[in-house]
């Protein structure tokens, strides 16, 4: 999946793909690891743009039925498999807001 680069569309693309995925099949999702803050801003402003694809990957890592690994190649390629999550991510909810350290993981503001 390498489409619109925006959270809502990427999430929709992955969920739709899961419906038709063969048993044991994999979904690959490109642009999962922005290196700079400017690479993940929506809407696109300038330069290299990965969008906020990474947010979908973080969210799906909290799902018990999706096993995900992220390869640190070509701006991040996430491998998604419908399977028991071998590394379930638990996000602590602090006063109704997601922990900003989790949301900004891997990003550096310029």
List the predicted regions and their residue ranges:
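Redox-cofactor binding/interface segments in oxidoreductases and associated redox assembly factors
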Residues: 1
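A short alpha-helical cap/connector motif
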Residues: 4-110
